Amino acid sequence: MSEIIEVIYEDGVLKPLKPLKIKGKKRLKIKIVNDDVEEFLKSMIIKKCKDIDYKKLKEAYYESF
């Protein structure tokens, strides 16, 4: 299962902004994406098109790393 979540880095710990559906002591891999990337995606001119699934576009972008 893959999921994109938002976190805040505070006191040396990444803290999710919403509850996670993960069992305790589960080992995961985390991809760190800076907010600058989010701002870039939001500012893209393509975003003005109505027929684009932006959730899928965003997920495809993150999966490319």
UniProtKB/Swiss-Prot annotation:
**Keyword Lyase included in the entry's annotation:** no
Pfam families from the UniProt entry:
AF2212-like
According to its UniProt entry, what is the function of this protein?
Possibly the antitoxin component of a type II toxin-antitoxin (TA) system.
Report keywords, A-Z: Plasmid, Toxin-antitoxin system
Classification via InterPro entries: AF2212-like, AF2212-like_dom_sf
List residues traversing the bilayer. Answer: none
Q: Say which family it is in.
A: Belongs to the UPF0165 family.
SUPFAM superfamilies, alphabetized? AF2212/PG0164-like (SSF141694)
**Species:** Methanocaldococcus jannaschii (strain ATCC 43067 / DSM 2661 / JAL-1 / JCM 10045 / NBRC 100440)
Please state what the protein is called: Putative antitoxin MJECL31
Magnesium: is it a keyword of this entry? no
